Design a protein with these regions (language model features):
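Amphipathic alpha-helical blocks and their helix-capping loop/short-beta junctions
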Residues: 127-157
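Short, solvent-exposed recognition segments
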Residues: 122-126
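N-terminal leader/linker segments that precede catalytic domains of diphosphate-processing enzymes
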Residues: 1-61, 66-120, 130, 151-152, ...
């Protein structure tokens, strides 16, 4: 999938109404789903968190984090976090839109922003937070037939998604947000998934 095809499909559908779940003591956070075109194919930018972090160590994630008091709004939070984690300057980011707010078990409600960056964009990792940055062809993670789902009845949400890619396993909130992006871009394929349990 190239840049033009993605933008056409993404813009076909209206932006989601932002509705936060009525849950107490949830903190605002954001992620930036960054897309970059390489050899006429869009890739999604992912990071592997440092194994020394206190929370979610070693997991695959998007750049992002919690909103701070001095942030003007959630988009400002997303741009600040991307700058801190991977050295991405705010002026190098083109925001395309956003997805539904995504609640996670750590008492955060996460707003995913979708954005484009240029192919030659350099990165500078904060080694304390990010062990590695890599890209995955967007088509690989948007095809719902590659998504696995595990159903858990006692969680805030009852489905945990897994998206294997080569030797990596994208799972949890990161996979869930990619699933939402896939459903937004390909609504006709929403019911396709591979269950891990009955």
């Amino acid at each position: 999938m190239n840049r033009d095809e993605f933008l056409r499909r993404f813009m076909l559908h209206p932006a989601p109404r932002i509705q936060r779940p009525k849950l107490h003591r949830m903190h605002a956070a954001v992620v930036l789903i960054l897309l970059v075109e390489r050899e006429q194919e869009l890739h999604v930018v992912l990071t592997q968190r440092s194994k020394y972090l206190r929370h979610h160590a070693g997991q695959i994630s998007f750049p992002g984090g919690r909103q701070e008091q001095h942030d003007a709004n959630l988009l400002a939070t997303a741009l600040r976090e991307a700058h801190e984690e991977i050295g991405l300057a705010p002026e190098d980011v083109t925001i395309v839109g956003q997805l539904h707010d995504y609640p996670v078990l750590s008492n955060f409600i996460v707003r995913p922003f979708v954005a484009l960056i240029e192919p030659q964009q350099p990165f500078k990792l904060d080694q304390h937070e990010v062990a590695e940055i890599f890209t995955v062809p967007l088509a690989q993670v948007l095809y719902q037939n590659r998504h696995y789902v595990y159903r858990l009845r006692r969680l805030l949400y009852d489905q945990v998604y897994f998206i294997p890619y080569q030797q990596r396993n994208i799972w949890g909130a990161t996979a869930g947000m990619l699933r939402e992006l896939a459903d937004h871009v390909y609504p006709e394929r929403q019911r396709i998934y591979r269950p891990l349990n009955d």
